[in-house]
Amino acid sequence: MSFRFGQHLIKPSVVFLKTELSFALVNRKPVVPGHVLVCPLRPVERFRDLHPDEVADLFQVTQRVGTVVEKHFQGTSITFSMQDGPEAGQTVKHVHVHVLPRKAGDFPRNDNIYDELQKHDREEEDSPAFWRSEKEMAAEAEALRVYFQA
């Protein structure tokens, strides 16, 4: 079973958490180590179009995932980011939250991370030549999946 993420089909091997309404996956081109995404299962383009139960689940999952990636990647803080609409920088037409574990000094200026996120999915940089291997992504997902097993 594949997961739909906007125009992309996501293989289960890169998904490390699934709930009734949301899923979390590793990023093919992370801005920092541990940069992952949390998405609603239903392919909804804009945040305003999510149902209340989807909003609740999305943010509960985001909170859980943030705690795990901060610990796993030895972060000391987390940046959560959502671009909602094209003028906000959204390139995949599916609501998603970027979860990025942070460390002191990971960027010269703390807010540089937003510049990197802005460049993250630009067409000229979003090609397979810039992506991690499926094997590397699956290994990371497997390592994160362990934290969510009951």
Swiss-Prot record:
Post-translational modification: Phosphorylation at Tyr-114 by SRC is required for induction of apoptosis.
Pfam families: HIT
Subunit structure, interactors included: Homodimer. Interacts with UBE2I. Interacts with MDM2. Interacts with CTNNB1. Identified in a complex with CTNNB1 and LEF1.
Gene Ontology MF, one: adenylylsulfate-ammonia adenylyltransferase activity
Catalytic site: H96
Coiled coil: none
Site (Important for induction of apoptosis): Y114
Protein's recorded name: Bis(5'-adenosyl)-triphosphatase
SUPFAM superfamilies recorded: HIT-like
Main location: cytoplasm
One GO cellular component term: cytosol
PROSITE patterns attached to this UniProt entry: HIT_1, HIT_2
Knockout mutant characteristics: No visible phenotype at birth, but about 30% of the mice lacking one or both copies of Fhit died for unknown reasons at an age of about 19 months. This might be due to increased susceptibility to infections. Mice lacking one or both copies of Fhit show increased susceptibility to carcinogens.
Location of this chain's protein in the cell: Cytoplasm; Nucleus; Mitochondrion
Binding site for substrate: H8, N27, Q83, G89, Q90, T91, V92, H98
InterPro entries, per the entry: Dinucleoside_ppp_hydrolase (IPR052677), FHIT (IPR039383), Histidine_triad_CS (IPR019808), HIT-like (IPR011146), HIT-like_sf (IPR036265)
Motif (Histidine triad motif): 94-98
Keyword ATP-binding (UniProt): no
Domain HIT: 2-109
A biological process term (GO) from this entry: DNA replication
Tissue: Expressed in heart, brain, lung and skeletal muscle. Particularly strong expression in liver, testis and kidney, where it is confined to the tubular epithelium.
EC number: 3.6.1.29, 3.9.1.-, 3.6.2.1, 2.7.7.51
Xref: CDD domains: FHIT
